Amino acid sequence: MMKNMILPIAFTALIASMTACSDETDPILTQKDWDGTATYFQSSDEHGFSMYYKPQVGFVGDPMPFYDPVAKDFKVMYLQDYRPNPEATYHPIFGVATKDGATYESLGELISCGGRDEQDAAIGTGGTIYNPADKLYYTFYTGNKFKPSSDQNAQVVMVATSPDFKTWTKNRTFYLKGDTYGYDKNDFRDPFLFQTEDGVYHMLIATRKNGKGHIVEFT
């Protein structure tokens, strides 16, 4: 059983005022010679993006970066946004691999949307870890129910596993629900995972309780 801790979100506002003046003595800005002063990558992708990855069709939503200790590269999962998206089933998880942040290899669709009546009809943001004990990748993600009834959860944290980061299998018995722990059943999303030096895995989830935003930690 996972243990949870309540971490209320503290919102802090910082107000700064600035004044500006100008006269004829202001320095004249000149165009920088970036070719002579900077080193940068030239993308080799056939579709020709220069810095930010964009799929050939649609757009990238909510990038979920993960360093792959097996392949020794970075995997960036993202929500594939077609615009327009289907009414009920949208935002499957796609991915790319990169070693330098400029040259990308498309991994295609990794985790598909569920059926119209399933909990993950629409997929929301998640996070990934690699467990060397069983040599599996675990991606925890948000399952968004299409038109949930009053007794159903609009958002649930779900999980899929893969031995090679290519073929993913959803665990249809794992459903982490906010109301099980006293939190909102409709706002329970965006799991973020990390491992501390003691080897313990942690998962942070954004949710609400009594009308206030919370970050919940599971270990």
Residue ranges, per PLM feature:
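Hydrophobic helical h-region of N-terminal Sec-dependent signal peptides
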Residues: 7-15
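C-terminal motif of bacterial Sec signal peptides marking the signal peptidase cleavage site
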Residues: 17-20
